[in-house]
Amino acid sequence: RHPPARAAPGRLRPGTSAAVICTVLLTTLVFGLGMNVSRVRSRSTRPLHDLALYYLPFATGLRPLEVARLTVGDYLLEDGSVRRESRVRADVAINGRDRPLFFNHRRLDEALGAYLDERIRAGHGLGAAEHWRGLDPLGPLFLGSEGEVYPITPNGREGQNRYVCRPLLEIYRKIFRQADIPGLCTQSARLTLMSRMYERGADEDQVGLVLGIADRSAVREQLPRPLPELA
């Protein structure tokens, strides 16, 4: 059995901004990830790459295809600092709708920073040395072990406009096996994020904004908001 993540004190107030929601939630979630992070680190052949990937769905609700489409410039500013308030661009989002994306936690910064440092040492995806930490801002945030771009291929019938990044999907399956949490997948990570948002007092609109779900009813279908207990 795996204990639930520790809850940070306090609840979100109505109207709390999406940026504050994500900051509070990631702070809460990482309390429960420590043991699993250690397993991933010790079992992975690419621990820096895989740890950064492991944190992302819990922190942001991003899907594997969206992760594959992220660029260095989505995460970094030109001066090399973290882009705290970013966007899931329309051409990145699975549903084709732009939405907010926040990078607001030290441990996620450390994981992504260590991975990008490793890329620089390996000479993968480099750009001008004085900008974006020396990386190409238009290049993918995550690359394969030899610096190759993860391929994104059509998935479904012609004209359906559906795509998949199969290598990254398989990497995520491997990472979650290494974490040794039965049933864990990127969708369950998204549901975990939704659950924590509800626990903090977020409503369906706030959940949908962060996770890229436009319809309140679709949010409820994935994970209904718990009803308040009667006194």
Identify the residue ranges that each predicted region occupies.
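Conserved tyrosine-mediated DNA breakage-rejoining catalytic core shared by Y-recombinases
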Residues: 69-109, 120, 125-131
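Short, charged phosphate-coordinating catalytic segments
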Residues: 57-82, 205-209
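Active-site/catalytic core of tyrosine-dependent DNA strand-transfer enzymes
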Residues: 105-181
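Flexible interdomain linker/hinge and immediately adjacent N-terminus
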Residues: 1-33, 148, 154-156
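Catalytic-site neighborhood detector that most strongly recognizes the C-terminal catalytic loop/helix
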Residues: 211-231
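Short, basic (Lys/Arg/His-rich) helix/loop patches that form interaction surfaces
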Residues: 160-161, 166-209, 213, 228
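N-terminal DNA-binding recognition helix of tyrosine site-specific recombinases/integrases
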Residues: 1-12, 19-20, 61-65, 113-126, ...
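Basic, Lys/Arg- and aromatic-enriched nucleic-acid-binding interface segment
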Residues: 32-60, 64, 190
